[in-house]
């Protein structure tokens, strides 16, 4: 994905303010609630029967944080997303058999969470940069599927 210097700056400056655990848990929780079929990949997480259970589930919160830590790796390697996510792509493709469309869904939910948390600070230009990033990450994660 091609990011301008301004877009890279918009991503990195906002990222430094992101509450990783809170935002990651919220994003994964929202994915499981808004797109309930995605919960089939998380059967071992215990109670995912309703929104309250999902958002209070410690395994959801922990895995969501892990997902955002991986986004942090992407932000450190904006010019090499495919290389950064090669092993995760292989894991999600070969072992977990995750539908790559789910990466796009989660990316969009991450953008929604950031917009909610940062309000007016999450400008249109910032959204453009983040949408490019989450699309690039989704593409990198789907790389092994091709």
Curated annotation (Swiss-Prot):
What biological process terms from GO does the record include? hydrogen peroxide catabolic process
Q: Which residues carry this modification: S-nitrosocysteine?
A: 93
Q: Which CDD domains match?
A: Hb-beta-like
Q: List every position bearing Phosphothreonine.
A: 12
* Sites bearing N6-acetyllysine, chain numbering: 59, 82, 144
Q: Which SUPFAM superfamilies match?
A: Globin-like (SSF46458)
- Which Gene3D superfamilies does the protein's record reference? Globins
Residue positions of the PTM N-acetylvaline? 1
- Assembly state and interactors? Heterotetramer of two alpha chains and two beta chains.
The entry's protein name is Hemoglobin subunit beta
